[in-house]
Amino acid sequence: MKSASYMIGFSLLLFWLSGCNEKSNVVNISTLPKATGQVVMDTNYIQIQPAWKGIEFSNPKNIKIGYDYILYVTEPDNDRIIMVDLAGTVLGHSQYVKRPVAITEDRRFNLIIACEYDTTVGGTTVTVAAIAKIRLFNYDHNISAAPVEIVYHESPQEHITRDGSGNLITGREFTGVAVLADNDYYITRSGNNNTSPVDPDNMILHLDKNDNPYPGDYIQFVPSLDPTGTGYKSIVMLSGITTFNSRQYGTDFITTQTDPNKSYFKVVWFTYSQGSELSAPSWNSRFSLDPTNLPDILSNIFVTPQAVMVDDRSNIYVIDGSLDSLMKFDLNGKLLHESFGPSKSGNALLHPSGITYFNKIVYISDTGHNRILRYELSTDLK
């Protein structure tokens, strides 16, 4: 077992405005143009038919189109990954992987999965947060034949206990995973015990391509992080993370959080500053923090953002599971009119929890309806 020794923590002020009528920075998504029907303001999203359903999906959660141009779907309730081609045909299922909640693929065609793992301590079986890899290249992309290898997991002392509704009581859980250009990857971790100054439950771990944590960088990040905060650097109740396909943004990442005690800063793009003789290294928001001109993406617009992704132009897409909405932003955090909610999509989404993008098409894991939906801009229709 490798111990968790690298952390990216976050903290800041919270502005709780729910229940207030004056929300100067709030963007009302209900006023945006419809996503289906007539074309409004030049562009809107049109659903591609048919929806992918009836092909074995059961509460699909996270989805990812990998560098092999194949869609991967996590099914936590069925303890498996489903492999689907871009025509909607199921190509296979993984071997058993316990409660997979997030997935990505590196450039070596390794699937990297945030999941759980059962281990035995003193004759008692306990469950811990884990990272699994499926090395597709070594098995000719036959996902059914490729073994599920646990490459990293939490200590048994941090084992998971949940209540009857599945909510975490004690222990740590991994909630997201995102790969970098050099095949390193980040893991988002959440938990309720955050009193430790060096190893709180709320962290973002950084592992190299061979699944080793980065202890050397650990010291650099500590001064600017606060895993219990409520500001733009906080990482309470992390739900997802994404990185960028190019080296232009280096180690940058975007996180989503579902903390109900937080109205602002639920989706933040972080970039690393090396510091100077007068300032310590730190993670900072790439978006403007000017309170008089706060970008839409940092405003009081989200309830439970579940997943985030970026396209080739660095447009940012966020799925909100409570609002049943897709929100699209430009790289400066401005909400774009292609965004849509229930009234604009004909109630197409129900508790969506995953999103991915390929070749101008947006794929959404419509969890409540047990299906995958695809959307294309009206201007891109052939």
Q: Could you describe each region identified by the protein language model?
A:
Residues W16-G19:
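C-terminal motif of bacterial Sec signal peptides marking the signal peptidase cleavage site
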Residues V27-P60, P291-T292:
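A short helix->beta-strand "capping" segment at the edge of beta-propeller domains
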Residues Q49-D79:
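Beta-strand-rich domains and repeat architectures in extracellular enzymes and scaffolds
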Residues I55-G66, V97-D106, I160-L180, D226-Y249, ...:
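Beta-rich, blade/repeat-based domains predominating
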Residues I70-Y72, N110-I113, D184-T188, Y249-T255, ...:
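Conserved beta-propeller blade signature
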Residues N78-R80, Y117-G123, G191-S196, T258-S263, ...:
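Short glycine/acidic-enriched loop and turn motifs that connect beta-strands
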Residues V84-T89, R135-H141, D208-N212, T271-S276, ...:
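Short loop/turn segments that connect beta-strands within beta-propeller blades
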Residues L349-K382:
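Blade-level signature of beta-propeller repeat domains, shared across WD40, Kelch, NHL, RCC1
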